[in-house]
Amino acid sequence: MFIQFRLPKYITSLIILLLFYSCNKESKLIWEDNFDGTDLNEQIWNFELGNGCPDNCGWGNNEKELYTKNNHKIVDGHLIITIKKEDSVYTSTRITTKGKKEFQYGRIEARAKLPVGKGLWPAFWMLGSNISDVGWPMCGEIDILEYVGREPKTVYTSLHTQNSHGNTINSKKTLIEDIEQGFHIYAIDWTKDKIDFYVDKKLVYTFSPQDKTTEVWPFDQPFYILINMAIGGNFGGFEIDDTVLPQEFIIDYVKV
């Protein structure tokens, strides 16, 4: 037996609204690099070279590495950054999208495989595009992924602002048993009100301050992406295990 009935108009309107909202929550891919070429695409990426001197020796953190163009390669659709010790110098690679690809809001994501060893400090992060005008930390910094080899099975997600004087008070340390094994996905969902941090699609931290002044929330402007592997320093740790070198930080893709 067929029974015909009608939903009240307000319920019908609510269902339509929810369906509309659900459809519009689907993210739209606006840019990606799958590292499918034979070398890094320098129309997208810049190399930052040297040790930060003379203005920012040790990259502001007493790091020990010297960045070169020679410590990266593209193999089978992966960007591989290698850190090694050459004579008494640690060499690595640091790349950015500054001035070429800059983003404001959305989902920023990378799939990566971490290196292992004391002193190592790989990172996938962002800086405010106005850094040359206002300096750091006024420009803001978003650390989507930081890993330090002295703390196995642990990843950091952090923010730096003028209000924190650059310190990582807006930070979360997440214990993940298999983080050094295979590839994992590191991402943020960034809106005008908050930044959600994810590891393997699991929410691990949210930053959503009520105060949206520039000192607390410089995240209302374009940012650019950085990928690097540091060694030693204030956060990486001053105990470095040379016996594990060389080590590789492998990135499968970056998507926005």
List the predicted regions and their residue ranges.
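GH16 jelly-roll
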Residues: 24-256
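Bacterial Sec-dependent N-terminal signal peptides
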Residues: 1-26
